[in-house]
Each structure stands twice: as C-alpha cells, then as structure tokens.
C-alpha cells in the first residue's frame, strides 16, 4: 500500500542525511542510481525528497548510504512535492532556470499551444535528462531535455 507525507519535513531531513552520507562515502548521484533500473534524474530527485522510490530501489540506495529500515520506508512514501519555498529563488543555479522561464516561458507556451493545442505538458508523465557536452568555442555546455506527455484541455 502506498503512503503519503503530510508535510515535507521528514523527507527534507532524510535528504539532509542522504547528502551527508553521500559526501562521507564519496558517492556520486550516478553511483546511487546505478543498479536501480531508474533514471539518474529520477533517483536524485527521489533522494532529495521529490519522488517515492520503488521498494527495491529504496533498499539498494539505503544500503549504499548506510540508512536504516525507517529510511527505506520513508523513501517509498509519496512526498509533499516542491523543494523551493515561495517567491523568487535565491540560489544562483536555480535562479537561472527561473530566469529562463521568465524569458522563454511565453514563447514555450505559444509554441506548445500552436503545435499541440490548448493543454499542458505533464510533469508527472515526464522524463528529465542532463548531459555535459563540449562547447566548440571552449568550455562545456549543458543539454537539458524536458520530455513530458502532452495533456489536452478537455471541455466539460
């Protein structure tokens, strides 16, 4: 049976423990995701308190991180999602995504509606990927893929 969280507190506290143990043990997010059968981005989001993990994946990552059975159970609970408090984000990396949506949000909306019609792109039936690629002009570039199912608005 699935269980859900009433507040984000328990999962946030567990996320703090995950981050501390990950650093102590010298593990990467990829190390933790390997062998779960799940995407790196999904496992990372789950360990940061934004998704529930299937039992086998929860047991695997908990074992790697030295977490107890209560943590295994907590990793399987449906969280109260949303890791950014209200208002404009202050973390520079997160703010850049906010800025991107400020600049390109209306463009994305216009193009989605023109190509698909009235509706939304799901963040539930969704895949996220990030790749580091070399920039021909020097340095690196981040290629971020947001892959969500289109859900049309249904008149009623």
Swiss-Prot record:
<dbReference type="InterPro" id="IPR003712">
    <property type="entry name" value="Cyanate_lyase_C"/>
</dbReference>
<dbReference type="Pfam" id="PF02560">
    <property type="entry name" value="Cyanate_lyase"/>
</dbReference>
<feature type="active site">
    <location>
        <position position="99"/>
    </location>
</feature>
<feature type="active site">
    <location>
        <position position="96"/>
    </location>
</feature>
<dbReference type="Pfam" id="PF21291">
    <property type="entry name" value="CYNS_N"/>
</dbReference>
<feature type="active site">
    <location>
        <position position="122"/>
    </location>
</feature>
<dbReference type="InterPro" id="IPR048564">
    <property type="entry name" value="CYNS_N"/>
</dbReference>
<keyword id="KW-0456">Lyase</keyword>
<dbReference type="GO" id="GO:0003677">
    <property type="term" value="F:DNA binding"/>
</dbReference>
<dbReference type="InterPro" id="IPR036581">
    <property type="entry name" value="Cyanate_lyase_C_sf"/>
</dbReference>
<protein>
    <recommendedName>
        <fullName>Cyanate hydratase</fullName>
        <ecNumber>4.2.1.104</ecNumber>
    </recommendedName>
</protein>
<dbReference type="InterPro" id="IPR010982">
    <property type="entry name" value="Lambda_DNA-bd_dom_sf"/>
</dbReference>
<comment type="similarity">
    <text>Belongs to the cyanase family.</text>
</comment>
<dbReference type="InterPro" id="IPR008076">
    <property type="entry name" value="Cyanase"/>
</dbReference>
<dbReference type="GO" id="GO:0009439">
    <property type="term" value="P:cyanate metabolic process"/>
</dbReference>
<comment type="function">
    <text>Catalyzes the reaction of cyanate with bicarbonate to produce ammonia and carbon dioxide.</text>
</comment>
<dbReference type="GO" id="GO:0008824">
    <property type="term" value="F:cyanate hydratase activity"/>
</dbReference>
């Amino acid at each position: 049976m699935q269980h859900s969280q009433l507040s984000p507190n328990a999962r946030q506290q567990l996320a703090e423990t995950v981050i501390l143990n990950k650093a102590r043990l010298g593990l990467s997010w990829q190390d933790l995701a390997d062998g779960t059968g799940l995407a790196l981005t999904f496992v990372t989001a789950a360990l940061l308190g934004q998704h529930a993990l299937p039992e086998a994946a929860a047991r695997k990552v908990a074992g790697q991180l030295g977490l107890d059975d209560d943590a295994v159970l907590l990793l399987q609970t449906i969280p109260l999602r949303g890791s950014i408090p209200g208002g404009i984000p202050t973390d520079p990396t997160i703010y850049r995504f906010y800025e991107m949506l400020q600049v390109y949000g209306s463009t994305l909306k216009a193009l989605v509606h023109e190509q698909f019609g009235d509706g939304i792109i799901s963040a539930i039936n969704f895949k996220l990927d990030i790749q580091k690629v070399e920039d021909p002009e020097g340095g690196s570039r981040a290629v971020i893929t947001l892959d969500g199912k289109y859900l049309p608005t249904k008149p009623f």
